């Protein structure tokens, strides 16, 4: 498949992060591409609670699906320790990390701004034993590249988890750093809490 711009989100008070009033709506081109699925149960929507439709939505806080893809727990702490100094004033950590560190969350979505942040960097692959052994160099790189999975439910939580992509050469990379045609298999790796 090919990636498409599906939705635009606008936070009125970025200093309040996910607690900010939020307006959101599907992109017209995306709706036209999926016209036969508008307002159907199994549409290619960002969430079952936000079906494809032509209306703009508004909530007093971020839509729930964002909590499922934003870094949380161990991933959030690690990322803020590493890149927190880059956070602009006037934006809370959750929005900063959403825009910076979610190029490949679980599911069929990507945060476009996070993917653009990572473009131009050289991809570094790791052998399976480095991943299994939780090699520090590997973990730091994986977190920095957005392979760490956050969120309050599902794949998120406190235990470190990573989405990885395996290349034809057998090396493992944080998901989204390799072009889709270079990937032969995807891996979801969950480490113990300690």
What are these regions (language model features)?
Residues 1-194:
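Phosphate/dinucleotide-binding and metal-coordinating scaffold of catalytic cores
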């Amino acid at each position: 498949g090919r990636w498409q711009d599906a939705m635009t989100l606008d936070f009125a008070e970025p200093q309040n992060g996910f607690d900010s009033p939020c307006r959101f709506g599907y992109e017209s081109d995306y709706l036209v591409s999926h016209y036969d699925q508008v307002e159907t149960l199994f549409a290619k929507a960002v969430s079952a609670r936000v079906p494809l439709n032509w209306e703009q939505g508004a909530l007093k806080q971020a839509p729930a699906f964002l909590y499922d893809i934003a870094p949380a727990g161990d991933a959030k702490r690690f990322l803020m320790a590493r890149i927190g100094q880059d956070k602009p004033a006037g934006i809370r950590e959750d929005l900063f990390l959403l825009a910076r560190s979610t190029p490949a969350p679980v599911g069929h979505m990507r945060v476009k701004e996070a993917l653009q942040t990572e473009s131009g960097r050289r991809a570094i692959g790791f052998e399976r034993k480095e991943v299994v052994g939780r090699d520090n160099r590997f973990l730091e790189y994986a977190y920095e590249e957005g392979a760490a999975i956050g969120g309050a439910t599902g794949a998120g939580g406190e235990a470190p988890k990573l989405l990885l992509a395996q290349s034809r050469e057998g090396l493992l990379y944080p998901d989204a750093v390799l072009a889709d045609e270079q990937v032969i298999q995807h891996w979801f790796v969950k480490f113990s809490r300690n």
